[in-house]
């Protein structure tokens, strides 16, 4: 193994000099004598390589000895990772002893070839009404949860994991990329309390970690998910938050001396996103269904980071601050959210017509809001009054109590099967529930619960 020495340290970027005949390859992992791991990013000539640190560079100094491992970063994969919390290097951070996996895989892998990839139109039921109705998920598809700060991305993500883990009993991998450590802790205990921890592998690279760590932790989680897929399983891969992956790339890019592009993002933004997203795919052996939370800076969906993510997704779930301010949770915007699966050939005529009917009614209500604000309800035609009444019921019926939020609001969570969701909304559109007061529709599960609530009002 070749050894070199540190010649320059600029924050998380470290230059190491090696003998000319033993220069490490790009992406090779290097071990500093202090125990820190570096990853080679550039070869500068003269035997010097520029690396990013996977941990804190505090306490490093020039002249320290560095050894080349001659391999990229490798992490443990397989069933031994289930129920464990690991860092970017696959080392346990839950004080439960060694992982003890039989196999280690490199975090840098080629995506499956065209021949290996498979396309599925099978729906994945989530039990969340608004998602199942308006932006249904495909098994083996990619889903983005878009939202600004504090509109409920992480809570939605936790509910999805809980529902899918309990109802579908598959394996999941959760990559916490640059999020709060408190959320990681909450998440661990939520999984433990729901008795699904033994089906989830957790990989954390939280906000306090250096950018090199946050840039690679998504790949660590993805590698573990790929192993489950290649064993013929249907695996779920959750990333919270894909924006922090981009942000880490921005920090590293500037330190590596690249010229920034629009809004200060790295010039390699699209390529970095593509490298990650192209690996999240389904093959003929198994599938990876991925749900990614995407932070939207200043609620601006045209920001380069969310805009780049859009191109890779099959379903987009857009969380809206306006809907959250009405107290309607999950705060999903049914007019902004989209899905490739919402096609009569995939979901069937009835589901498609009900979903489009719901969107049409809500859109008409949105247009009438200005008139109502100026002239009041009395100036509307009878037909429009009916549209408004039904739209307000639909808005409230799109809310739902979550299992993961039980501890905060004391309302028991609800899992609503897809056929019940369609039945409920079809009834509202057909006018079967025009006599029921709108408050009965708020925070209910199925339409039968609404009728029960209405009796007590």
Curated annotation (Swiss-Prot):
Keyword Transport recorded: yes
Top-rank taxon, per record: Bacteria
Topological type in the membrane: Peripheral membrane protein
InterPro entries: AAA+_ATPase, ATP-synt_VA_C, ATP_synth_F1_bsu, ATPase_a/bsu_AS, ATPase_alpha/beta_chains, ATPase_F1/V1/A1_a/bsu_N, ATPase_F1/V1/A1_a/bsu_N_sf, ATPase_F1/V1/A1_a/bsu_nucl-bd
Primary residence: membrane
Residues engaged in binding ATP: 147-154
This protein's UniProt keywords: ATP synthesis, ATP-binding, Cell inner membrane, Cell membrane, CF(1), Hydrogen ion transport, Ion transport, Membrane, Nucleotide-binding, Translocase, Transport
A cellular-component GO term for this protein: plasma membrane
Catalysis performed (reactions): ATP + H2O + 4 H(+)(in) = ADP + phosphate + 5 H(+)(out)
Role played: Produces ATP from ADP in the presence of a proton gradient across the membrane. The catalytic sites are hosted primarily by the beta subunits.
Name of this protein: ATP synthase subunit beta
Species name: Pasteurella multocida (strain Pm70)
């Amino acid at each position: 193994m070749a050894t070199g020495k540190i010649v320059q340290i600029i924050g998380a970027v470290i230059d190491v000099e090696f003998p000319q005949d033993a220069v490490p390859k790009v992406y090779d992992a290097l071990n500093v004598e202090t125990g820190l791991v570096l990853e080679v990013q550039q070869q500068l000539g003269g035997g010097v390589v520029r690396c990013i640190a996977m941990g804190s560079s505090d306490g490093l100094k020039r002249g320290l000895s560095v050894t080349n491992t001659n391999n990229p970063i490798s992490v443990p994969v397989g069933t031994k990772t289930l129920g464990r919390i690991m860092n970017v290097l696959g080392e346990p951070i839950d004080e439960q002893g060694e992982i003890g996996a039989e196999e280690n895989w490199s975090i840098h892998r080629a995506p499956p070839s065209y021949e290996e990839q498979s396309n599925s139109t099978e729906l994945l039921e989530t039990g969340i009404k608004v998602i199942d109705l308006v932006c249904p998920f495909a098994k083996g598809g990619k889903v983005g949860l878009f939202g600004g700060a504090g509109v409920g991305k992480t809570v939605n993500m936790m509910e999805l994991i809980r529902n899918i883990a309990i109802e579908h009993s598959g394996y999941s991998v959760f990559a916490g990329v640059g999020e709060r450590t408190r959320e990681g802790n909450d998440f661990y205990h939520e999984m433990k309390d729901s008795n699904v921890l033994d089906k989830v592998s957790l990989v954390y690279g939280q906000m306090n970690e250096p950018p090199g760590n946050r840039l690679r932790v998504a790949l660590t989680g993805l590698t573990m998910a790929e192993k489950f897929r290649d064993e013929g399983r249907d695996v779920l891969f959750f990333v919270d938050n894909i924006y922090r992956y981009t942000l880490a790339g921005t920090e590293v890019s500037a330190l590596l001396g690249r010229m920034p592009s629009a809004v200060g993002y790295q010039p390699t933004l699209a390529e970095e996103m593509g490298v990650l997203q192209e690996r999240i795919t389904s093959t003929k052996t198994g599938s990876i269904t991925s749900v990614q939370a995407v932070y939207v800076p200043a609620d601006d969906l045209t920001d380069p980071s969310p805009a780049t993510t859009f191109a890779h997704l099959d379903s987009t779930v857009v969380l809206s601050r306006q809907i959250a301010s009405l107290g309607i949770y999950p705060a999903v915007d049914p007019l902004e959210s989209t899905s490739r699966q919402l096609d009569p050939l995939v979901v069937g005529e009835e589901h498609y017509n009900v979903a489009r009917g719901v969107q049409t009614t809500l859109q008409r209500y949105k247009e009438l809001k200005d008139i109502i604000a100026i002239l009041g309800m009395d100036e509307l035609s009878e037909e429009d009054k009916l549209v408004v009444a039904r739209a307000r019921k639909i808005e409230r019926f799109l809310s739902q109590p979550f299992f993961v939020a039980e501890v905060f609001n004391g309302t028991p969570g609800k899992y609503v099967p897809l056929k019940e969701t369609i039945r409920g909304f079809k009834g509202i559109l057909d006018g079967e529930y025009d006599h029921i007061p709108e408050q009965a529709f708020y925070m209910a599960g199925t339409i039968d619960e609404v009728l029960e609530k209405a009796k007590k009002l």
